[in-house]
Design a protein with these regions (language model features):
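Residue-level structural signal for beta-strand termini and adjacent loop
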Residues: 30, 42, 100, 170-171
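Glycine-rich phosphate-binding loop and adjoining helix at the ATP-binding site
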Residues: 41-144
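Glycine-rich phosphate-binding loop of actin/hexokinase-like ATP-binding domains
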Residues: 141-198
C-alpha cells in the first residue's frame, strides 16, 4: 500500500484564549493547528473597575472573538483564560488580586462555561504563559524548566516532570509581596517594601517619573 501524507485539518476545531492584567484584556483565536487567526486587545485600568465589570469586559472580548469566527464558532472546542493574582486552577476559582479589590473567590470557570456552553480552562496567567512558551519554543519536549515573569508582579515558577509546581495552596512562586531590604515604596497591597513595588513594570515607570521630576532624567 502506498504511503499517504496526512495533516491536521485546520478547520477541525477552534480555540479561544483570553488573558487580563492590570492594564489590558487580550483575546485570541486559534485554529486546530494552533495557528493564530484572531488577536485583539482592549486597554483597561482594573483598579478603577469592579469584579463584575471586568468579567463583563472579558465576556465581551470573547463574544467579539466568536463574532470574528462567524459560522466557524460552532466548532469552538474550548476557552482558556489566564488570570492575575492568586487562583485555584483545579476548581477554576480566582481567589484574589491586589489591583482589583472585590476580586474574591470568583468561580470564573463556571461563569464562563454557563455563558458560552463550552469547556473552559482557567489558570494563573503566568502558568498559562509557561505552557505557551514550553510548546511554542521547545515543542513540549522540555520537561523541567524555571520560568521568571516580571510584569505588574513578580513570579518564579518551576516546571518539574511537565507540571508546574503550585504548592499546597497554589501560591508557589508568588514573590511579589515578599518584603525586600531597603524597599520604601507603597505596594498595591497597602504594605511598604514589597518586591512588586521595586521591580515590576509599574514600579520602574514610577521610578522614571520620579527621576524626571527631580531632574535625574530628561523627558
Amino acid at each position: 500500500r502506498k504511503p499517504v501524507w496526512l495533516r491536521i485539518n485546520p478547520e477541525g476545531g477552534y480555540f479561544l484564549g483570553v488573558e487580563f492584567n492590570r492594564n489590558a484584556i487580550h483575546c485570541v483565536a486559534l485554529d486546530f493547528t494552533g495557528k493564530l487567526i484572531y488577536d485583539a486587545e482592549r486597554n483597561i485600568e482594573t483598579s478603577e473597575k469592579t469584579a463584575d465589570q471586568v468579567l463583563e469586559l472579558v465576556k465581551k472580548m470573547i463574544y467579539d472573538g466568536i463574532a470574528f469566527l462567524g459560522e466557524k464558532s460552532k466548532k469552538v472546542i474550548g476557552i482558556g483564560i489566564g488570570i492575575p493574582g492568586y487562583s485555584d486552577a483545579n476548581r477554576g476559582i480566582a481567589i484574589s488580586y491586589s489591583h482589583l479589590k472585590d476580586w474574591k473567590n470568583i468561580p470564573v470557570k463556571d461563569i464562563l462555561e454557563k455563558e458560552f456552553h463550552v469547556t473552559c480552562y482557567m489558570d494563573n496567567n503566568v502558568n498559562v504563559m509557561i505552557f505557551a512558551y514550553k510548546w511554542l519554543v521547545y515543542g513540549g519536549k522540555c520537561e523541567d524548566m524555571l520560568f521568571v515573569s516580571i510584569r505588574t508582579g513578580a513570579r518564579v515558577i518551576p516546571i518539574i516532570n511537565n507540571q508546574p509546581v503550585r504548592g499546597t495552596c497554589g501560591y508557589s512562586g508568588e514573590l511579589g509581596h515578599v518584603k525586600v531590604s531597603g524597599g520604601s515604596r507603597i505596594c498595591s497591597c497597602g504594605r511598604y517594601g514589597c518586591l512588586n513595588s521595586e521591580i515590576s513594570d509599574v514600579a520602574i515607570v514610577n521610578k522614571i517619573i520620579d527621576g524626571i521630576k527631580v531632574g535625574r532624567f530628561r523627558e
